Amino acid sequence: MKYPIILCEDDLLQLHQLERVIDKFILFHDEIFEVVLSAQKPSEVEAYLKQFHPKQGIYFLDVDLKAEMDGMELAQIIRKHDVQAKIIFVTTHDEVLPITFKRKLEALGFVQKDQDYDEYKKEIVELLLLAQERIDAAKVSKTQAFVFSIGSQTFTFDINDIYFLE
């Protein structure tokens, strides 16, 4: 099972920058992650949630979406649809950090948009790997798992998701 990645950023240039970083990362992790939606409007994300019901998704959200709702409100909707979601805010507004605790959003992390590109990229990659690690740990603790390694990568699958091994 690939982990779905959903992006929501109203600024097209910022969205493309985020997509580039994640796409480069996925080149080496394509069996684990997949960008399933890249949106500029929160309503697109909400429609996707209602139609496809993703589970254990990784969500990159701009806090200050210039739309009918902001990133915090969108995160609350995501949390209702995908309880185990890993929510990462990409923002220039570090003053919103306490609000995420107040709203009980359980954000996995915050990435500053206005930092050096290499640092920006490094944070995103670290958060993707952390999201994978936490989702895998939750799976293993809940179910029987089939675990194997190829090179330096370890793969974990729910035993119920396996139909056949060759």
Regions found by a protein language model. Give the residues of each.
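Non-catalytic signal-transmission and effector/linker regions of two-component phosphorelay proteins
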Residues: 1-4
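Short mixed-charge
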Residues: 28-35
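Amphipathic alpha1 helix at the N-terminus of the CheY-like receiver
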Residues: 13-27
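Acidic, metal-coordinating helix/loop segments flanking the phosphotransfer/catalytic sites
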Residues: 16-20, 35-58
